[in-house]
Amino acid sequence: MAISTFKRKIASVRVSVASPEIIRAWSSGEVKKPETINYRSFKPERDGLFCEKIFGPTKDYECACGKYKGKKYEGTVCERCGVRVESKEARRKKMGHIELAAPVVHVWYLKSSPSILSTLLNIPARDLENIVYHGSRRIIERSYIITDSKKTQFAAGDVLYETEYEVYKKVLDFDAEIAVTVKNPKSPVVSDIDGEVSIKSEQTNTGREIIWITVKDSKKIPIQLQPGMILLSKNGQEVKEGTILVPEKQIAPFYAPFDGTVEIDEIASTLTIKPLTTSKEQPVTVTIPYCVRVLVKNGSKVKAADELLSGGTIPAITSPASGKVVFGKELNVRPLEDDTYEVLSAGMLYVEQLIQEKRYPIFEGSLPYVNDGDKVKAGDYLADRFLFEDEVLSAHEYKIFEDYYPQQFTVEAEVENDRPIVAVTEIDDELSKETGLSVGSIITESEYEAYKELYPGKIEAHYGAAAVKKLLEKIDLEKLKAQIESELSQLPRSSGKALKLLKRLKIVKNLIKSGTKPEWMVLEAVPVIPPELRPMIQIDGGRFATTDLNDLYRRVINRNNRLRRLLDLNAPDIIVRNEKRMLQESVDSLIYNGRIGKAVADRNGRALKSLTDLVKGKKGRFRRNLLGKRVDYSGRAVIVVGPDLKIHQCGLPKKMAMELFRPFVLAQLLKEGGESSKTARKMKKAIIEKEMPEAWDILEEVIKGHPVLLNRAPTLHRMSIQAFEPKLIEGNAIQLHPLVCPPFNADFDGDQMAVHVPLSAAAQAEAKYLMLSRYNIISPAHGKPISMPGKDIIVGVYYLTAIGKDFDDVKTEEIRYRFGSTEEAILAYSLGYVDLHTPVLAKVKVSDQEKIVKTTVGRIIFNEIILPDLRDYTRVFGKKEIKNLIYDTFKRHGIDATADLLDDMKDLGFHYATVSGLTISLKDLIVSPKKDEIIRGAEQRVEQVEEEYRRGFLTFDERYREIIKIWNKATEDVQFVTQQALGENPFNPIFMMVNSGARGNIDQVKQLAGMRGLMADPSGKTIEIPIISNFREGLTSMEFFISTHGARKGAADTALRTSSAGYLTRRLVDVAQSIVITTTDCGTHEGLKAVELISDDLTVQKLKDFLFGRVLSRDVVDPLTGEVIKNPVTGREYVRNAMLSDEDAEFLAEYVVSVPVSVEQVLDLQGLQLPHCYAEVCEEIRTVDGVYYEEGTELNWDVVRNAKNAGKKQLKIKMYPVVGTISEQVIKDKKGEKELVVLREEIDELTAKILEENGVSQIKVRPNIYVRSVLTCEAEKGVCAMCYGMDLSNHKVVNVGEAVGIIAAQSIGEPGTQLTMRTFHTGGIATTADITQGLPRAEELFEARKKLKEPEGIFSTETGFVKDIKEVEGRQKIYIEDYSGGIHEYEVPEKTKVKVRIGQKVLPGTPLTTGAIRLRKLMDTLGVEATAMYLLKETQKVYVEQGVEIHNKHFEIIIKQMLGRVEIVDPGDTDFLPGQLMTISEAEKINEKILRENANAQSNRNFVLGKILAKKVVAKVSDEVEEIASEGTEVTEEILEKAVESGVKEICIYDEGKQITYQIAPKEPMRYRRRLLRITKASLEQKGWLSAASFQQTPQVLTEAAVEGSIDLLEGLKENVIVGQLVPAGTGLETFANIQIEETPRAAEAEKMA
């Protein structure tokens, strides 16, 4: 039956942002409850995360309640339980959703770097996050306290923060003072002195109370006052010392006014006259003044006018001291009219002399502990505090307390507050102008409250995802685009602001292009993935284990339900706000746990795996499941050697084969029985299971010609999977042919291999004809054999073809045995007349000729298996000779002959290795007698050096270097004499092993039987004490200790290498995977100049190796004749597009001719043919119309035409045949000081003239050879077959469809493990730095590291001569003189050494010093080709140093990917950003398209007239973004003119019902420059998002791709593996899609054979 292999099913994959509608459309129901399953019945809970109604039934075709069972009810929805009857597979596909009670921002868009939402909304990421998470902004601001509220609603003492104050102050009239906040007031208030307390209170300017507590300490001087005295001072009045308190007073005598009786009261000091009873007078009382005598006695009777009191004087009283007047408590006074007092009774007056007084203000609310008049002691408490913590004081109040309590409290003039922030979502235009706020401005909540109060209804602000959503809904993308574009047109493109705008513009354009609404980045509903993808499993002990996702979903549902409940209850805002934040956080951790804040963890502290974790990283969906797919039909087993197999066979254990081929056996059994019923199947299965004999017979039949694939992990290159024909064997191990071990890197010490069975006919055909091991003998990495005999086979062949020590001494005539044919010789051997190594003469046939040769029977036996034209009876065959023999066989006779030769060689080798009886014993290790003498000599020389050092003739470093040198020489000498001693007996087993190349090398023999030599210490520095012993003699303990460093380092190295090498391979594969041969010939004439690769005087690659396997891009011309070169042996002409084999490469590499520098000639202008080389005119030419050519003008057709016009018949010319050739010798000037031409320099006309001036007539040169290379290929995708050249695995031109990128990556990555990690030390000398080698160097180059491990070297940028090298101000400088005499100065960097000498000729790129060259610098100064060649040379060097051979083309593919991008410098009118990267071909195409469309702009304008607009036209007109025309408008001349004037370049119209964009004004093309990318960056820069996402930074790549609505056209290999299609390479290409494959029945096949 004819079947077509495949048709491509999926053409492209698009990723975009899902709208809430789409999320709901995906869903089959809303998940409302966090429950999963009922723990009693184990049934899913209704409306829970495993609900059957939403996700489908748990049992096939059965509803939840069991009412409907069976497939016949499919599609029925059960009315009882609501479950739809369908296959349980639905639970893998059906999704649910959670309706969110509040919108939630998708964390990918919020926290991508740079944040997409932040860029789009033009809000700083920190602020945006704070809005989303209901956060706050830390604000440091002043506060104000109101002192006079005037007519506002404020009260005195209200506090306003600066932000609100500014808002209110603009509109309202009130007075306020700057406020301060009190911090750390000391308490309680303590009296500092003894004294008396007085208390009073007062009000401050903010209307608050201050209580003043005063404590006085004083001394009182008492003054006795007597009645009648007049007191001049008031109570409390301050008086000075000597002030008159009581004035002097004259008192007149007192006479009785009438007759009466006298009563004297001595206590009251009064005198009373009582009248007679008959008199009408009233009694009179007078005070007896101080210092007056009473002249009468108490009770005596007196007559009127009797003198009662004598007169006298009251003396004046002055103040004894300065102080305050204080009235005593018993002092009784009467105020008089003139502000004085009359003393009524005796009492005390005090002058209080104040010693000290202290006042203590305390603020309202503080509690005083004392009362007025209390006496206190120092240290007594007066009040609990004077101020409260965080009390806000006006400046005035602060001043009071600062004066009275210095340093007892601190204040903060600015308050640091975390203020909740909101985003403005709507604002009135006038208010916006007035306040400077706009939609999207972030303000604090208090500011918002102020604005809302002052401008009700004119401003709206929100927080949380709702705010972001509102802001996103407000965005008019078209308008925003026009606005950004007009802003950009006024900025320099490289400015920071412009770059920010460009990033924003890119997002806006991407959203427009993909048709995504910005608000979709905020989730209204969260999709719930199918339950089977997040299963719950019962584990032992009845508990359930669940996927982390269920926990994360549960948190979301719980918080969502709680928020819904709070909203229904109208809970306080602060609670709702907190719940919204928690909901946002729970959705974040569901999508990307740990991206924001601390990751949600389980009870063991392990972070839960969120949806993002399922996608990203090595264990994510991409790398684990999509790219790391498992292969069906496979078994694995240990491998053992199968020495009797053919190279294309493998031994398959019977049991394993039966298991693998079971379906085939079953089918065959059924076919033979001709039945297919269920019972028949059962019976036949039983036959197989019981292993009946007929099952084995059929297995034998089925297996015939059915190849199997064997794979050994790690699969480092394509040779790690090969096809074999299986042979059934007993036992449980797979038998493997010994010769296929090298490609698999397998050995038989317990390695395992996997077996895969190709099932379809197409797969079998591929395995048989492409993957069979006999077709994989040649390595695609270098084109040489890889399936090579090793170890014992080599020893066997070597033993067979080896000769005794005296073979060469035996003369022909002395030889006893002479044979007429090879058969005779072999017969004589088998009969025991001669042994293998006896010299014999035999008649042999070599390439169709018979001749007699002196040989041995062993050599005759070996040559029997070789094809006649390759036989050689005169040499011994070691590893190298065998490799060459295999390679020559392949080149001359093809792969099949090679495979047969290998098989024969294996049989011979094993047989004769056994016959040879190879063993090793200690006796075989022969220690040379000369060893001791060499060591003694070295020790003496070391002693001399030490002596010189002691005398001070040598520095420490010089001594160290000398000693190392001496011991290195001694070690070499010992090695040489050891080798000699061993070679005495050619059949010494160790000598045979080493000499044949089977195992070990002379270095190891030196350590076994010579001396171990010098060792390195852990830092890599050489230890100067050598190990003099060898292992045969045994080491001393000191020597043993010194040896351990290296051993440990080796072990550590190996472990580190493997992982680094694996990662390097992965990056290489990633960067090159999309390079496939897409076409036979791209037609380019570009190419690389073939050169020898030389780095630091080490020939990294010979010219012939550079040429091998290449295609010529130009004819190779003989410098002398100008004709195409022809190979005299093969007759091949080396014209353009000829592919070079080994022989061709060798011939061209050695093609050197001696050419004259210049030749003078007369050119006949009649029979015209221009010379084949560069030539100049030797005379002046003047034409009639004034054209003039001076002597020395280059000859070309213009010159010839004008010479003819000038009437010339002949023209004197000078030809320079050397120009354009490659010099093969160094030529110096006459003095021998200056190099005129260096080796391998391309000679230009200037150089040729310099040679001529210096009298050089002839020079040896080789032709310039240009080969095609992938670096210069112009194929649109991938590369073309001609530029790639030879497929190294079969030496033919590569096939279209070959995945050369992956082969390149494998070829470079596979030997990675062999590369050392070490950074070698150059004998511990400080001046030259460590040389980075091996893997780190390879990585440094591929990753184009900016930071180099070794110091940076410098290179020449000119062609010229080294004029001078000298030290200027402590820095070494190199001066180079160019051809025109200009001098260029180069400063030698520190830690590097000069590599050039005076008089040396340098070319651009010649390194002037040691050290690594910075790739980007090289690229900027010398361009792409020089960089590519440097990279090629340096990467090759890393591998060559380790003895690894890899063809250049593999490196070139990687380098092509590193250099294949351009960076946009100025995007012109394209949608790209400066700094964006794209491939060269894309950039060229875009510019071509722009130029093409610019030509059509005018005709497009005519075409669109009268058509209907599909999208509105928006542009910035005089500072305002205006709509020029709305959607659905007819296009008119006016609209077009206005649009073009405003800078609109294209419009979108309806044309025949479709939306088509037409360009209506010329656009600016973009400018770009080549960029060098490191391989990781190059991988991420790939076009398709699938490939980039599966490489690194998965979430970031997917986020950007979704916003862009990116479409992956599945061009690379990875993308197709991910979607599960055949890869577009090899037989997966469209070209092979229609091949018809027919499966011929076995019987018919057998008939044909017969």
Swiss-Prot record:
Keywords: DNA-directed RNA polymerase, Magnesium, Metal-binding, Nucleotidyltransferase, Transcription, Transferase, Zinc
Positions with a binding annotation for Mg(2+): D747, D749, D751
Name of this chain's protein: DNA-directed RNA polymerase subunit beta'
Membrane-spanning residues: none
Pfam families: RNA_pol_Rpb1_1, RNA_pol_Rpb1_2, RNA_pol_Rpb1_3, RNA_pol_Rpb1_4, RNA_pol_Rpb1_5
Catalytic activity as recorded in UniProt: RNA(n) + a ribonucleoside 5'-triphosphate = RNA(n+1) + diphosphate
HAMAP family (UniProt xref): RNApol_bact_RpoC (MF_01322)
Residues involved in Zn(2+) 2 binding: C1082, C1273, C1280, C1283
Entry GO MF terms: DNA binding; DNA-directed RNA polymerase activity; magnesium ion binding; zinc ion binding
GO cellular component, one term: DNA-directed RNA polymerase complex
Gene Ontology process terms (BP): DNA-templated transcription
Homology family: Belongs to the RNA polymerase beta' chain family.
Protein residues bound to Zn(2+) 1: C63, C65, C78, C81
Cross-referenced InterPro entries: DNA-dir_RpoC_beta_prime, DNA-dir_RpoC_beta_prime_bact, RNA_pol_asu, RNA_pol_N, RNA_pol_Rpb1_1, RNA_pol_Rpb1_3, RNA_pol_Rpb1_3_sf, RNA_pol_Rpb1_4
Transmembrane listed as a keyword: no
The protein's required cofactors: Mg(2+); Zn(2+)
Presence of keyword Lipoprotein: no
Subunit structure: The RNAP catalytic core consists of 2 alpha, 1 beta, 1 beta' and 1 omega subunit. When a sigma factor is associated with the core the holoenzyme is formed, which can initiate transcription.
Annotated function: DNA-dependent RNA polymerase catalyzes the transcription of DNA into RNA using the four ribonucleoside triphosphates as substrates.
Gene name of the encoded protein: rpoC
